From Swiss-Prot:
Residues 25-258 form the Peptidase S1 domain. The lineage of its organism: Eukaryota, Metazoa, Chordata, Craniata, Vertebrata. Keywords: Disulfide bond, Glycoprotein, Hydrolase, Protease, Serine protease, Signal, Zymogen. The keyword Manganese does not apply. Residues 1-18 form the signal peptide. PANTHER family: KALLIKREIN-1, KALLIKREIN-RELATED. Glandular kallikreins cleave Met-Lys and Arg-Ser bonds in kininogen to release Lys-bradykinin. This is Prostatic glandular kallikrein-6. Residues 19-24 form a propeptide. It catalyses: Preferential cleavage of Arg-|-Xaa bonds in small molecule substrates. Highly selective action to release kallidin (lysyl-bradykinin) from kininogen involves hydrolysis of Met-|-Xaa or Leu-|-Xaa. The gene is Klk6. It is an enzyme of class 3 (hydrolase).
Length: 261
């Protein structure tokens, strides 16, 4: 039950402000400005909902469990409250959740025995292409399998505290490691499949949290995953988080983008 709750709250909007001077995703730091130019803030109406990644001037990827209506996105943002020179606002014309993802988990807020969170990936088609600048850039899809032990970076505007939700204005980054899927299988009763990646720190203290869903997992400089689900409280020892394994979906993403220019 706690895992399902976190899976849902990872994609809920910001409601609280971070205390002054605190700069953590969970155990992270303020990202250097414009160091993550592919990072996207996905909004439901006017409320931040999830993270996302710009993979083409007209396409953003995020988590399928962020599925909603009336999306809009911000590109080139570091601080969500300030006017910034590279910031670009775009509306979304259409969303494409992966057909293999079980949307009933989200719609019914329940999970039947045997269900899992496989295929937690969605494409968002922008009404107007992004302008590529120093602050807004695309990142390539992976071409090779990630290696266990790789140093990874994940980012987002999610909660900086593990239970009492407090949200930063500035984009947060945290360095973690890619772990074997067996680590996550051992940590959770929920099924961890071959279309998922396991990443975090077994000692705890560094993790994604509420609001980070759909954001990037970049390992050794390569986009390899999208934030999907984890435990609550965030950042607990022996409870790494789970990410969608993008290399398993490159053919599907390219097909959708080609058929919907």
């Amino acid at each position: 039950m706690w895992l399902l709750i976190l899976f849902l709250i990872l994609s809920l909007g910001w409601n609280d402000a971070a205390p002054p001077g605190q700069s953590r995703i969970i155990g992270g730091f303020n990202c250097e400005k414009n160091s993550q130019p592919w990072q996207v803030a996905v909004y439901h109406f006017n409320e931040p909902q999830c993270g996302g990644v710009l993979i083409h001037p007209s396409w953003v990827i995020t988590a399928a469990h962020c599925y909603s209506v009336n999306y809009q996105v911000w590109l080139g943002r570091n601080n969500l409250l300030e006017d910034e020179p590279f910031a670009q606002h775009r509306l979304v014309s259409q969303s494409f959740p992966h057909p293999g993802f079980n949307l009933d988990i989200i719609k019914n807020h329940t999970r039947k025995p045997g269900n899992d969170y496989s295929n937690d990936l969605m494409l968002l088609h922008l009404k107007t292409p992004a302008d590529i600048t120093d602050g807004v850039k695309v990142i390539d899809l992976p071409t090779e399998e990630p290696k266990v032990g790789s140093t990874c970076l994940t980012s987002g505007w999610g909660s900086i505290t593990p239970l009492k939700w407090e949200f930063p204005d500035d984009l947060q980054c945290v360095n973690i490691h890619l772990l074997s899927n067996e680590k996550c299988i051992k940590a959770y009763n929920d099924e961890v499949t071959d279309v998922m990646l396991c990443a975090g720190e077994m000692d705890g203290g560094k993790d994604i949290c509420k609001g980070d869903s759909g954001g990037p997992l970049i390992c050794d400089g390569v986009l390899q995953g999208i934030t999907s689900w984890g435990s609550m409280p965030c950042g607990e020892p022996n409870k790494p988080s789970v990410y969608t394994k993008l290399i398993k979906f490159t053919s599907w993403m390219k097909k959708v983008m080609k058929e919907n220019p």
